[in-house]
Amino acid sequence: QHAVANWKRIIEIAVDMGVPVINTEFSGDPNQQEICNGMFFKSMEELLPIIEREGIRVECQSHPYDFVELNDEACDIVKSFRSKNLGYVYSASHGFFYDQGKGDVRHMLKYAGDELTHVLLADTWNQTKDCRYIVNPPWLNQRGRADYTIHQHTAMGEGEVDFDGIFETLRDMDFANKQLKPDAPKVGGDNIICVSYFGFPEKMDQQAPEALDRIKHELL
């Protein structure tokens, strides 16, 4: 109830400021999926009518250790509302959690389809591969992924994410132009793609312009 009240206030502030898009995460606990799933839908029963009335777009992102981590399941939740006011955020650095280590970015983006309104670009290693990351105490490395999660947000090319596949699929989906058309599938204006690099601020003067140049080259 407190979270729903906070969200109502967030929506009010967004409307007052003229902000057309809010993005958020599913949150919750992967060890209590049924409870979290029920509470999410209960909350949306109250919030979605307000979101639609105000004409804003709310975008949902699955994050490692959320109650829903898999890309297709997260997309199904967004799709189930059949609302032009809800979108899906795809974070490239979470992709190995989204499909349990396969890294099939083409499938994941295509599955999202018209729900996809926001893409975050950053690289990471495949956490399902042996010794890509080493966590202590050692027994954590052999337990279920619900016990801990680890990933990175490094520059494109520094990890194992298939960015060629991401950009190729986004072009095939006409991601850059889809929301500019009269029959746009969602409200809230243009689709969004941005860089989500963390951890190395001393490299940003070089890496940020390089990322912008690549986005422009690949999509515009």
Regions found by a protein language model. Give the residues of each.
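A short, acidic, amphipathic alpha-helical segment used as a generic capping/interface helix at domain edges
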Residues: 158-185
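Active-site acidic/histidine proton-transfer and metal-coordination neighborhood
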Residues: 1-90, 202-207
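Short active-site-adjacent structural elements
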Residues: 127-130, 201-205
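C-terminal helical cap(s) of enzyme catalytic domains, especially alpha/beta-barrels
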Residues: 204-220
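Short, acidic/polar
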Residues: 2-12, 100-109, 163
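Hydrophobic faces of well-ordered beta-strands that scaffold small-molecule active sites
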Residues: 22-24, 58-60, 86-90, 117-121, ...
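Acidic/histidine-rich catalytic cores of soluble enzymes
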Residues: 45-155, 160
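Hydrophobic pocket-lining residues that define ligand/cofactor binding sites across diverse proteins
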Residues: 14, 51, 170, 174, ...
